[in-house]
Curated annotation (Swiss-Prot):
Gene transcribed to yield this protein: coaD
UniProt KW Transmembrane keyword: no
EC class: transferase
Name of the protein this chain belongs to: Phosphopantetheine adenylyltransferase
Site (Transition state stabilizer): 18
Family, similarity comment: Belongs to the bacterial CoaD family.
Function noted in UniProt: Reversibly transfers an adenylyl group from ATP to 4'-phosphopantetheine, yielding dephospho-CoA (dPCoA) and pyrophosphate.
Originating organism: Thermodesulfovibrio yellowstonii (strain ATCC 51303 / DSM 11347 / YP87)
Example GO BP: coenzyme A biosynthetic process
Pathway: Cofactor biosynthesis; coenzyme A biosynthesis; CoA from (R)-pantothenate: step 4/5
Length: 161
């Protein structure tokens, strides 16, 4: 039986921290699905879902046993459809843990058979978030060491002044 993990997020945009989690999750699961959320009730993404999928697909094209798919609605419904055994989440700090623990409990309540696997980022990415990347790029700072080259270029174009 193939053990499939799902790494969900908006990935707006994907960062080197996300890539770190993806590569490490692939060591645990037979297959990993990067599940790109179509939309979020929290905020409007700066990149379309198609752009976000493209960025992820391009930066992970050399990784085996990885799929990039879009989902909309409840994550647990996507998990059931894909017959996945676990949700993969990155934890940077205690504040992440509190929020992620609530999500894990809610997902477990909705689908009793799902597990959540928390992965700590490599130390160099422990501060990194998509929001931080967007803010730095918006104000003209360099995000070269924080995101893949395709994303850096897209951010520069998006925030040209």
């Amino acid at each position: 039986m193939t053990k499939t993990g799902v790494y969900p997020g908006t990935f707006d945009p994907i960062t080197n921290g996300h890539l770190d989690v993806i590569k490490r999750a692939l060591k645990i699961f037979d297959e990993l699905i990067v599940a790109v959320a179509m939309s979020s009730y929290k905020k409007t993404p700066i990149f379309t879902v198609e752009e976000r999928v493209h960025f992820i697909a391009q930066t992970t094209k050399d990784l085996k046993n990885l799929k990039v798919e879009v989902f909309d609605g409840l994550l647990v419904n996507f998990i059931k459809e894909k017959k996945a055994v676990a949700i993969v989440r990155g934890l940077r700090a205690v504040s992440d843990y509190e929020f992620e623990l609530q999500l894990a409990h809610a997902n477990r309540r909705l689908f009793r058979d799902i597990e959540t696997v928390f992965l700590m980022p490599s130390e160099e990415y422990s501060f990194l978030s998509s929001s931080l990347v967007k803010e730095i790029a918006y104000f003209g700072g360099s995000v070269k060491s924080l995101v893949p080259p395709i994303v850096e270029k897209a951010l520069r174009n998006k925030f040209k002044k």
